[in-house]
């Protein structure tokens, strides 16, 4: 078995359960094999640039700012600031009048649901656990997925201390060996970006009926 086969088995499980997911989500602090989401608004505005979302959050907080304010806050050149601001304006999120930037639409009250990331490995559970911890910056929960025959080699205390959950994969079935703990370091902006990427990946997918699954306890009601 290859790691790609393990990931494909997990993908199949998620599809059969009607769960939205994305593979190899690039977040700058690691690439999660699988990121899934429950409960986020399907009309979430897709924004995948950290500075873009950060600038929007800044304008939203201040209600109106100047190009200079943004330059000073984010230490960016004027042309770069204009590029970001005009992108936000084209999306209908801000309006520009001379050098003044005003918020038009607050997207930060939107429901982001629950985001879970998974690192899949065949044997290297220690490395996988370390990698999964990085995902807690943009996920509510993080798991390591291993083939069922590898589980016996794992020191569960390391997972318990780090808050990383553990999944056993056998064929296309998933069993939760250890539940994950909720992240205390999840950054809202990073979560917005990761969640919007999952939503964007599934925008053309017909809404599926969500079935009971190994992650059911995390589904928002």
Describe the role of every protein-language-model region.
Residues 1-38, 47-100, 221:
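Acidic-basic catalytic patches of nuclease active cores, encompassing PD-(D/E)XK
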Residues 12, 18, 26-28, 39-54, ...:
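Non-catalytic C-terminal interaction segments of nucleic acid-processing enzymes
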Residues 81, 103, 128, 151-152:
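Amphipathic coiled-coil/heptad-repeat helices and related helical stalk/stem segments
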Residues 99-110:
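Accessory beta->alpha helical hairpin/"wing" motif in late/C-terminal subdomains of nucleic-acid enzymes
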Residues 124-125, 139-173:
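Nucleic-acid nuclease catalytic cores
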Residues 132:
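Catalytic core segments in nucleotide and nucleic-acid processing enzymes
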């Amino acid at each position: 078995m290859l790691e790609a086969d393990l990931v494909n088995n997990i993908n199949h499980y998620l599809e059969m359960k009607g769960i939205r997911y994305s593979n190899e989500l690039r977040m700058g602090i690691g690439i999660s094999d699988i990121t899934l989401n429950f409960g986020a608004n399907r009309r979430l505005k897709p924004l995948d640039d950290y500075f873009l979302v950060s600038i929007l959050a800044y304008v939203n907080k201040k209600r109106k700012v100047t190009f200079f304010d943004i330059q000073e806050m984010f230490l960016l050149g004027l042309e770069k600031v204009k590029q970001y601001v005009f992108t936000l304006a084209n999306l209908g999120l801000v309006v520009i009048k001379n050098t003044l930037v005003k918020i038009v639409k607050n997207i930060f009250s939107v429901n982001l649901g629950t985001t879970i990331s998974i690192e899949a490995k065949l044997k290297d559970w220690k490395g996988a656990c370390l990698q999964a911890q990085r995902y807690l910056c943009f996920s509510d929960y993080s798991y390591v997925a291993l083939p069922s025959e590898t589980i016996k080699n794992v020191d569960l205390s390391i997972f318990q201390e780090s808050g990383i959950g553990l999944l056993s994969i056998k064929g296309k079935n998933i069993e939760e060996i250890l539940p994950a703990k909720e992240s205390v370091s999840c950054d809202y902006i990073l979560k917005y970006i990761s969640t919007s990427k999952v939503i964007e990946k599934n925008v053309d997918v017909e809404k599926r009926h969500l079935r009971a699954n190994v992650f059911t306890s995390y589904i928002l009601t």
